[in-house]
Amino acid sequence: MPRYRSLAVAIVSAVGLGWAVAALAGSGQGGDHAGSGFGYHLVKTVALGAPNQWDYAVFSPTTRRLFIAHGNRLTVVSAGTGRVVGQVGPIPGGPHGIAFDPAANLGITDDGRLGQAVIFNLHTLKIVKRVKVQRGADAVTFDPVSRHAFVIDGDTGEIAVVDPVRGTVVTFIHIGGDLEYAVPGNNGELYVNGVTHREIFRINTATNRVDATWPIPQCRSPHGLSIDTRTHRLFSSCENARLVVVDSLNGAVVTTLPIGRGTDSDRFDPKTGLIFSSNGLDGTLSIIHEVDANEFVAEPAVKTAISGRTMGIDRQSGRVFVVAAHTTRQTMDRFMAQRQKTHRWPHWSPFTPNSLRLLILDPGR
């Protein structure tokens, strides 16, 4: 995703400026939370504090902690208690993506402005190495087969391949165009969302070369990406409020399903067969049930909060985490009206100061 997109930027990129204001006018605050699909409901809200800048949220099964790209650090939250237990930082240029090498007890994030892969100890949270990569680094993912991290510059279409144990760059993969999230398969492949031409790239992680390019024309600006390795299905969430299901073996589009507006993350839970999309414009969590490889059912959405565009999931418990800052319809209307009038982004934030929070949702029991 672009660097620390505010809600307003996310809305404009998703639906266009004119539609954005109209959509906000009917959306309210997004402050009321109600459970629907599979009984998901809000159980806890955790204050994260200043600044109101955030990006990806990724759950570590090894430590049972959620890592959130937040300002100039990673904020670390216990998945069980919901308490903030530490930070990884400082990361002066701001982190975006997060990935883990659990066998080496390492985490990998990025400093986008300084162009660094930042490697840290998963348990002590101490930074152990900073590796020079490309400026504008954004999404980060880890391939368990090659044991390499992939640091994606979404704006230039370049991917740095990093060995986190050695703390070195292996190579750079140049794809070109705008890139978004990436997810590994089980057999040494990496799938990457291509925004510019609506496609998914498959990279062979042994050769670090693109060996397939698959069009997904139904998906305008693919953002989130997750995978069911058992059924060989990729799930790409799109800014035109669609989830596109793609065969990870041959790139065929299996189906498309409706989701909310303003998606920036999606996650798959293999335990339940549920696909989730966090939607910042609508302030909802879309839930889709994978019945089998070819049958998918869109379940009732669950209200979260306007701006809640990134998420994580604890696949052991089914607990879902959504990050959001508080804003109101009136504030966003004023913000967007000023943008329309001046054709520039206002120099003030549409969010209530120090209002960043983590919403924790559990399934029904």
Can you say where each PLM-predicted feature lies in the sequence?
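Bacterial N-terminal signal peptides
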Residues: 9-22
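Predominantly soluble domains enriched in secretory-pathway, periplasmic, or organellar proteins
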Residues: 19, 24-365
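Bacterial N-terminal signal peptides that target proteins for export
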Residues: 1-11
